[in-house]
C-alpha cells in the first residue's frame, strides 16, 4: 500500500539502491518451483546487490523444512502450515526501510500509516529514471543521510506526528553516521543503540528484526493484531478481549526460534 512495489502482469518491480546507485529489480514466477530475478543497474555489483536484497525480501533461499516438520501437526498453526507451506513473513528488502516504516506505523491504523509513507516517498523519495531520461514512477525510500538532515517540521507536514518525526530523524542519523549497522551480524548491538532513542521500544525493534533482518525468533508482541488474537484465544472466543504483551510472549514461547513465523501463520485465525 505504500506504492514501492509495482506489479505488471506476472512481474513485480522494485527500485532499490546500492549506496547511491539505483537498481531496478524485476521478479517473475513462471512455474510453481521457479522464480526468476533480473536487474538493471550501472554495474554488475549493484545489480547483484539488488537481486540479493529482493531474494531476502521474498525468502526464496530460506530452508523452512525444520519448521514444517516440527509444527505440521500443531493444533493451532498446523492447518495453515499444511495448506500454505510456502508462507513467509512479509519482509522489506532493506532493514532501514523496515525500521523507518515501523516508526511511521506506531499507534495508528495501517491505512493512515501507508498514506504517510506515500507522502514521504512523493516528497523525499528517490525516483527511478529510465535510460531514456524519463521518470518511471517507481520510488525508493530516501537515503538515510537525507532523512537525517530533514527538518522535523517537513515530516510533520506529511502527517507524521512530532515525536515520530524526531524519532525517525534520530534513527536515520544513527544509521547514516555508522553508529548502527543494520546489515551487520551483531543485531543485538544495533538494537540496544536504537532502544536508546526516545520513541523506539520493543515493538519497533522487533518489527525491524522480523521484517528487515530475517529474525524469525523475534516476535512483535505489542502488535494490536496479536494482542487481539491471543486475547480471543485465551478468553474462549471473546472478540473484545485483549491480551497483555507478556501473555502474547508466553503464548508463542513454545514456538521458540520460529515465533515470528508462527505468528504469521496464526494471525489469520
What kind of feature is each model-predicted range?
Residues 1-269:
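HhH-family (HhH-GPD) DNA N-glycosylase catalytic core used in base-excision repair
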Amino acid at each position: 500500500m505504500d506504492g514501492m512495489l509495482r506489479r505488471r502482469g506476472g512481474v513485480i518491480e522494485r527500485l532499490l539502491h546500492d549506496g547511491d546507485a539505483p537498481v531496478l529489480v524485476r521478479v517473475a514466477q513462471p512455474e510453481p518451483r521457479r522464480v526468476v530475478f533480473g536487474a538493471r543497474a550501472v554495474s554488475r555489483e549493484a545489480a547483484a546487490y539488488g537481486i540479493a536484497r529482493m531474494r531476502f525480501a521474498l525468502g526464496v533461499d530460506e530452508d523452512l523444512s525444520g519448521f514444517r516438520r516440527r509444527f505440521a501437526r500443531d493444533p493451532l498453526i498446523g492447518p495453515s502450515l499444511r495448506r500454505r507451506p510456502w508462507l513467509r513473513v512479509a519482509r522489506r528488502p532493506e532493514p532501514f526501510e523496515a525500521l523507518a516504516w515501523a516508526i511511521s506505523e506506531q499507534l495508528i491504523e495501517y491505512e493512515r500509516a501507508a498514506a504517510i509513507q506515500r507522502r514521504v516517498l512523493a516528497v523525499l523519495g528517490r525516483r527511478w529514471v529510465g535510460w531514456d531520461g524519463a521518470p518511471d514512477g517507481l520510488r525508493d525510500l530516501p537515503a538515510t543521510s537525507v532523512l537525517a538532515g530533514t527538518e522535523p517540521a517537513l515530516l510533520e507536514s506529511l502527517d507524521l506526528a512530532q515525536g515520530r518525526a524526531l524519532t525517525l530523524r534520530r534513527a536515520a542519523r544513527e544509521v547514516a553516521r555508522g553508529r548502527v549497522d543494520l546489515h551487520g551480524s551483531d543485531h543485538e548491538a544495533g538494537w540496544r543503540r536504537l532502544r536508546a532513542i526516545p520513541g523506539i521500544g520493543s515493538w519497533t525493534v522487533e518489527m525491524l528484526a522480523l521484517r528487515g533482518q530475517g529474525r524469525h525468533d523475534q516476535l512483535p508482541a505489542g502488535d494490536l493484531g496479536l494482542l487481539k488474537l491471543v486475547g480471543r484465544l485465551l478468553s474462549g472466543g471473546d472478540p473484545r478481549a485483549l491480551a497483555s504483551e507478556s501473555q502474547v510472549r508466553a503464548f508463542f514461547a513454545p514456538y521458540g526460534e520460529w515465533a515470528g513465523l508462527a505468528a504469521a501463520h496464526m494471525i489469520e485465525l
